[in-house]
Amino acid sequence: DNGMDRMEQLKAVLSLCLIFGVAFCLGSVVGHTVSVRDQAVMARPAQKDWGLSFQEDNKPPVADESMEQLAQYDAFYAENTTEKVLYLTFDCGYENGNTPAILDALKKHHVPAAFFIVGNYLEKNPDLVKRMRAEGHIIGNHSYHHPDMSQMGKEEFQKELAQLEDLYEQTTGEKMAKFYRPPQGKYSDNNLQLAKELGYRTIFWSLAYVDWKQEEQPTHEEAMSKLLKRVHPGAIVLLHNTSRTNGEILDEVLTKWEEMGYHFASLEELVSSGGREARSFFLTDNQENPVKSAAPT
């Protein structure tokens, strides 16, 4: 009986060893699998979508990143100031007839703006782009194909910007200004750093409204209400050139903002260390050589 008991005990011990051994191996395999997956996730840049929370009329919104966080990448979404200065920017994905009216309103009010264009826009509308430059506006880089750039590596990211730079230089005979706006508002810390390394300033925004839906264009009243309530000192304004409403109300919006005490400056003035000395150029009737004054530094 004692021999049998010892045999049973030995079997029990061996069984336990086998169970623990299998469990250990499985744990190691599962642990290794999780580790590899975690490494893959960690290696992939975290995609972010630029967003704003408008909480108080005529005050800066709560943004996804602080000005200090963005500053390390030469990126901006507004100017930290109490001065009633605005920076107008337009995203141009395609042309549907509203840009001439937008340019007319800007010219009437002597307002400098930045137009962020894509490859297709430049290919199909070279004369409009040349008019933008002739009237003193900045042409910014919105990428060539308007993809989600947030997950791109350096080579692919650089190619998207360089393709548009090359076409712009072929079309206009001048170098493109080094301002970048992330397509679709999607970005990562990684490509903010890549843009900085390529000499770009990334330009987000602090004032916008839903103006891009072609079948759901806001009424004049809806648009005016949002644009007048959301305006604040130092705002970078994002509007879409494809908006019929924007083309129709921009003259009135600029007038209202001026009546509220606002004036307008160029992105070049926002990022320059010397401040906004150049603003006086745009506030006079001297439009003889606006291209030179608005040329990239």
Where are these regions (language model features)?
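Active-site beta->alpha N-cap acidic-glycine motif
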Residues: 51-150, 156-169, 176-177, 272
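Short low-complexity, flexible loop/linker segments enriched in glycine and/or proline
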Residues: 129-132, 155-157, 217-220, 279-284
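N-terminal pre-catalytic segment of deacetylase/amide-hydrolase enzymes
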Residues: 5-89, 95-103, 108, 222, ...
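Catalytic grooves of carbohydrate-active enzymes
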Residues: 231-268
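Active-site beta-loop-alpha junctions enriched in small/polar residues
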Residues: 93, 118-120, 144, 183-185, ...
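Structural recognition of the beta-strand scaffold that forms the well-ordered cores
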Residues: 86-89, 113-117, 138-141, 178-182, ...
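Alpha-helical scaffold elements lining the catalytic groove of polysaccharide deacetylases
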Residues: 65, 98, 147-172, 186-233, ...
